[in-house]
C-alpha cells in the first residue's frame, strides 16, 4: 500500500484486501498501535479549516479511502483506482488468519 495526499490529506491506495491484511498484520506485530480513519469528501474539506481535526487526521496510521470523494480524488489526481475496503471484516479475517486475539469495548456495559 502506498500513501498519497488528497488536498493535503493522507490516504492509502489500497490495491487489494490481501495488501491491507499484510499491512494490518505488520502493524499489530510491530506493537506500535494507532488508529484508522475513513477518508471522505467531508473530512477532506474540514481538514483545511480545523487545525485540531487536522492533527487527528495526520495521526492516523491507516487512513483509508471511504466514499466517492476520496476514491474519485485518487483517480483524478493520480490515475489510480483504490478498492473500497470493509475494514472491520478485513481486521477480523486478518486476526483469524494470524491467530491474533483482541478486545472490543462497547459504549455501554450492556453491549460489552
Task: List each model region and its residues.
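Conserved beta-alpha
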Residues: 70-112
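N-terminal nucleotide/polyanion-binding subdomain common to many enzyme families
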Residues: 1-88
Amino acid at each position: 500500500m502506498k500513501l498519497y495526499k488528497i488536498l493535503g490529506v493522507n490516504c492509502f491506495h489500497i490495491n487489494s484486501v490481501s495488501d491491507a491484511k499484510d499491512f494490518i498484520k505488520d502493524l499489530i506485530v510491530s506493537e506500535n498501535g494507532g488508529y484508522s480513519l475513513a477518508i471522505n469528501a467531508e473530512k477532506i474539506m474540514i481538514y483545511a479549516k480545523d487545525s485540531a481535526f487536522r492533527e487527528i487526521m495526520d495521526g492516523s496510521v491507516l487512513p483509508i479511502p471511504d466514499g466517492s470523494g476520496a476514491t474519485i480524488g485518487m483517480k483524478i489526481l493520480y490515475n489510480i483506482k483504490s478498492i473500497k475496503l470493509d475494514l472491520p471484516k478485513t481486521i477480523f479475517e486478518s486476526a483469524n488468519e494470524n491467530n491474533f486475539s483482541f478486545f472490543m469495548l462497547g459504549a455501554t456495559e450492556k453491549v460489552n
